[in-house]
C-alpha cells in the first residue's frame, strides 16, 4: 500500500472513522480535509448489498444532478443526416460516423462521452473492445443510444452522470467540486442517493445500502449517516 502524505495524514485526523456524519457535516468536512491544490472532485461511494455476478442484481443507469458536476463534458456523437445536423445544433463537440471510428482505432480519445443513434451501433460495435474497458461504450440504459440526440446532449452538458455497480458491489459517482457551495453538494448527494435507492434490484436481499461515504480526490473518506436527511 502506498504511503500517505503528511497533509493527508493530518487531514485524516479530523475525521472520526467510527462516526457516521450528518450529510451536511460530511460535505463540510470533506471540503475541509481536501489536500489537493486544484479544484478537486467530490465523490460519493456506495457499498451495496447486491451480488453483481448475478444478472438480476446489476445496477446501471444515469441521472442529471441538479447542480452539475463542475466538469465540462466533451461529447462525441455518431449520427448521420438530419440527426448529425441536430447533434451539431445541440452543441455536440464532435459529430461524425466512420471518420471518427477510424480516429479512435488510431488512438484518439479527446472526448468524455459518446452518444450514438441506434442505426450507428453496428459501426460503433467495431470499436467496442476499445471503448468497453474505458467505460465509453454507448448504452441504452444510460440514454446514450438514442435517436433523441438533442435531449441526450443537453442532459450530458447539464451534468448527467452515469453509475454502475462494480464487481465488489460498490458504486462511485462524482457529485461536484470542492469549490461548490455546501448546499449544492448536499442537493447533488441527495439526488444521487435517491436514484440509487430507486435502482434497487428486486432480487437483492437483506440490507441494500450498507455504507455511504463522501470523499474528495486526495482526501479521506467521510462516512455519511443517511438517516439524517429526507430523500425525495
UniProtKB/Swiss-Prot annotation:
Q: Pfam families per the record?
A: Ribosomal_L1 (PF00687)
Recall the GO molecular function terms of this protein's record.
rRNA binding; structural constituent of ribosome; tRNA binding
**Key words of the record:** Repressor, Ribonucleoprotein, Ribosomal protein, RNA-binding, rRNA-binding, Translation regulation, tRNA-binding
- Name any GO cellular component annotation: large ribosomal subunit
Q: Which CDD domains match?
A: Ribosomal_L1
SUPFAM superfamilies membership:
Ribosomal protein L1
- Please name the GO terms of the biological process aspect recorded for this protein, alphabetically: regulation of translation; translation
Q: State the superkingdom.
A: Bacteria
Q: Is rRNA processing among the key words of this record?
A: no
NCBIfam families (UniProt xref): rplA_bact
Functional description taken from the UniProt entry: Binds directly to 23S rRNA. The L1 stalk is quite mobile in the ribosome, and is involved in E site tRNA release.
Q: Which family does it belong to?
A: Belongs to the universal ribosomal protein uL1 family.
Oligomeric state and interaction partners are given as: Part of the 50S ribosomal subunit.
Protein's recorded name? Large ribosomal subunit protein uL1
Q: Which gene encodes it?
A: rplA
Amino acid at each position: 500500500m502506498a504511503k500517505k502524505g503528511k497533509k493527508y495524514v493530518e487531514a485524516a485526523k479530523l475525521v472520526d472513522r467510527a462516526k457516521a456524519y450528518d450529510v451536511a457535516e460530511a460535505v463540510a468536512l470533506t471540503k475541509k480535509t481536501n489536500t489537493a491544490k486544484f479544484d478537486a472532485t467530490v465523490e460519493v461511494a456506495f457499498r451495496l448489498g447486491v451480488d453483481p455476478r448475478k444478472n438480476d442484481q446489476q445496477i446501471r443507469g444515469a441521472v442529471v444532478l441538479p447542480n452539475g458536476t463542475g466538469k465540462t463534458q466533451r461529447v462525441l456523437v455518431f449520427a448521420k443526416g438530419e440527426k448529425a445536423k441536430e447533434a451539431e445544433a445541440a452543441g455536440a463537440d464532435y459529430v461524425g460516423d466512420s471518420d471518427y471510428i477510424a480516429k479512435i482505432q488510431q488512438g484518439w480519445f479527446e472526448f468524455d462521452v459518446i452518444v450514438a443513434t441506434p442505426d450507428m451501433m453496428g459501426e460503433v460495435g467495431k470499436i467496442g473492445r476499445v471503448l468497453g474497458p474505458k467505460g465509453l461504450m454507448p448504452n441504452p440504459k444510460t440514454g446514450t443510444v438514442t435517436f433523441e440526440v438533442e435531449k441526450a446532449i443537453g442532459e450530458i452538458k447539464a451534468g448527467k452522470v452515469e453509475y454502475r455497480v462494480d464487481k465488489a458491489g460498490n458504486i462511485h459517482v462524482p457529485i461536484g467540486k470542492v469549490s461548490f457551495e455546501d448546499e449544492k453538494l448536499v442537493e447533488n448527494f441527495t439526488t444521487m442517493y435517491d436514484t440509487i435507492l430507486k435502482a434497487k434490484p428486486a432480487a437483492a436481499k437483506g440490507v441494500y445500502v450498507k455504507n455511504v461515504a463522501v470523499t474528495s480526490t486526495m482526501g479521506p473518506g467521510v462516512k455519511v449517516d443517511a438517516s439524517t436527511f429526507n430523500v425525495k
